[in-house]
Structure formats: structure tokens, C-alpha cells
């Protein structure tokens, strides 16, 4: 945090910030901006210059996929799902976070690897985003060529950037040290940690301040900027997280849990607040339209898969509410492509996906003697279309339009793996990625639908919640859930639906945490051996499940893992941060 404070202070001493950080394709304040004597008045002398400060704030927003040397690559250029039950890392190198810190239980407040943790408080980029946003808010009044409406909208964008940045911290560590202004060099560096409740309230407060001034949806030119729909959706996400049982309970989630990491009691009103946020979102959606689930062009498995793909992959559509960008073309994701063979989805995840008609896939499916083909029958998919878009399964095409190397007699098969590969964002062929600008779909409309359904179910029961879940299912051709489903069964159905819809979108980890799903952290994980009837372009397979290497958590589970440890050296700096339970 003192590094963060130092950055905030230096930016004012040396002309607000390193102006080279603000150069996007053209020279901002000369060829040697750090020594040019640039000051606040220069940086806010025009709308164009001021926008570069706000753009810098945008560039520090979280991006869930590895992107080159970006400072917030997590888990050693791996994915958050690799420490959930959906995905397993097999990368035996020294920098891999899952294998070196999580699967063996070695992560601690004093033991870490650079960029190998899921989240390292004080070393992430959120405070950079906050820094630039506050500088913008405090100085944009100096800009002479902006209308009042333009100024208010840009300030609202900056406030949402701050709220989103704190929201990321909140989900990983609970209460945070809150900076609500740009820091003066001679300011006393004391920022006491806020409680869990205070942090949630402040995030929601910033969003409430931003919502009235944001556009509901941006036009094509401004696409990627923050919107009212995104702010309202993020508000629901935070309220739902805070209302969930891990934090909203009379029973503490850990013996050392305190006011910084939970409420310490149960209140139904927290669920009601989440439900109200959902009501407000859908009331606005009914009035303004413009957002909707991307629908298939025809009622076929391939069309449904492509509609689902467009919903998460494509910029400027009707589904992504918060889009974060790190680059334009597919090369932005080269690190992901390069590492695609060294981790794999678990059979546990694959088994969550129902048959194509919506019927549950059997828990006791006989893989050695299947009564029905589990992936393809005469070339036609037999399962939920989202399975194939999230997971490369035996018989599908992969990356460069060749057979996915996931069956044992494929010439490129790797013995260290799960028998599956990640498909999402990687896709089947180069043509799928060409001329298709990339993004991180930080928040999508299906999450708002399912979050609202969850809140309704917890407050009122299933009846009024079902239609929101069924919208998500119907888009990919699945049948409605039973109309007589009970509250607990619907709760499970929603959590599963979220796993299916948001694979590799950083949703599953937080769902497991907020619902205290210790059994999912401890359960055995499986892979699947598949052998094709021929080496090239097989049309049928034989199968055999196998156990993946047990993680430390299986026999040594501790709920401390629900929140990240605070590095001890951060606490020792004495500005106000405290340790999380169990660490």
C-alpha cells in the first residue's frame, strides 16, 4: 500500500503522473514528457488531453485472461478457474500459481511468487485505476471545451471505474483501505481498513452517484465506456455477493472472521436489497431496451453455440454490460494460446452440462459402456451447446481447425492433462478469431438474469424466479426447469447454470466462496481417457475416467481460503491494513 501511496504522491510532485503512461499512439506532451515540466493545467487544458487521463484509468481495469506482460496476470499466467473445481493446471514450472501455491497448500502471508497468486493485495493494478480516476474527477472542471453534460458523464465514468476497482478488492479480501481523493505529498499516510459493511456501502454509494449521469448504452463510437446498465448490473453483483451466506450469517465463516470480513449476523434485508437492485435494472431495461440475449439464427445446435459465442466474445453487441479491453486483435491473447495444452477442464465440469434437451447428464453415467454417445452422435452434438464452446471434447475441432488433441491416440496428445482443453476465447479455427476484436466480458446480461433469480428465490421462493433462469437456458435450446421446483433445488440449479454459462469468466470461484461450498473445494476431481477408432478424424471413442492428483484441500480444508492473505509486509507498513482470518 505504501507503494500505492508513493505512486499517488509522486504523480503530484512530478506533474500528476508519468505522462508517457498517457501516450496512446501520439505524443502527449513532448518526446521526453517526464522532464517536460507538464503540470495539471496542461493535462486538463482540453477535452482531448483530459480524456487521456481517464483512458489511463480504463487501462488498469481487471482482465481475466493473460495478456503479455500485463502487471495483473494472475496465477503465473493461468486462470482463476484453475483453483476451482472446473479446471486443473498441469504446468510443472516454477512460476505456476495453482501447482506451487494452492494445490500444495503453501500459500501464506509470507510465502508467495511474483504474479502467481490469484490476488495479492497492494500489488494489483486497481489502485492505479483509482489514482487516475480521482485525478480526473478533481481536475476536469478546468477543461474549457466541455459541456456540463459531458463533464458529468465523464465524472460518472470515473466513479464507476473506482467502484469497479474496489469491487475487485472486496471480493478477494473483504474490507479495504479506502482512498477517496488524490493524495497530497505531505499527507499523513493513514488509511484504516474499512469494515466489510462499510466497503460494500461505499462501492454501492459510488455506483448510485454515477448511475444518473451515465448513458444506458454507448453508441458504436464510444463502445467500451462505462454505462448505466453496467453500473446497475455491478451494483446487483456486489449486493448479491454481500448478501450470500458466507458473509451474511449468524455463524461466522471462520473462527477468526471479524467485522472486516463479514457482517457478523444475518439479515434478510440484504437479500431484499439485492432483489431491489435487480428490479431496478429490469425496470430500466423494459423502458429503454437495447440489451438482450443474443439469439440463434435458427434452431440448430451450431446456431445456438454461435449465438452463445457472440454473446461473450463480440464487442458492441446487446449482451456485454461491462467490456474491458487490453488490445484489439487476437494476438492480445497469445499467452493464452501458447499455454492452452498445459491445463484442462475437469470431467466434473463436463458432467455438469445436460443433454441437448435440458435433461440432466446422469451422475452415474457408464463411461465404459455408454448407453448414449456423450459428445457426438453421427457428427451431431448430444449435449448443451455451451459445453462445446467452453470445453474442447473428443471429436471437436480446435484452434486451427484440426482435431482437438484430447484422445490418447492423437499424435499430439499430452499424457499430463485431463482429457479436455479450454475452448472458450480460443475457439475452433483461425477464421473464428480473425477480424474479431477481443475483449474481457467483465459483466454480461445473463449474470444479471441469474443473480436476480437467485435473490428472488432467497426472498420469495422459486415461483417468480424461474422465468429469468429459463431465459438463459432457452437461448441454448434447453427446456424449462420444472415449475414445481423447490427453493433449495432452484438454488442448486442457479449455481450450476452460472457455472455452465460463465465458464472461464471468473464467476465460479466467487460463487463457491460466497456460498461456502467447502465440499466442492474438497471433492475428488477427474479426467477422462478417450481413444478414437482411428488416429485421424475418429468418429467414435472409448472412454475411461481417472482421478486427477488430489489437491491439498481434499484432506486439509480450511475456510481461510475463501479470502486472500494480506502480505505481511503490507501490514507491517502500518498504514491500516489488517490480516485476513486464518492467515
Question: Where are the language model's segments positioned?
Answer:
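Long, intrinsically disordered, low-complexity segments
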Residues: 18-22, 126, 202, 296-354, ...
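Extended glycan-interaction surfaces of carbohydrate-active proteins
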Residues: 207-210, 393-436, 519, 564, ...
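Bacterial Sec-dependent N-terminal signal peptides
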Residues: 1-31
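Conserved, well-structured interaction surfaces
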Residues: 39-55, 59-70, 93-173, 187-223, ...
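An aromatic- and glycine-enriched ligand-binding surface/loop that stacks and positions planar moieties
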Residues: 20-100, 176, 208-209, 225-232, ...
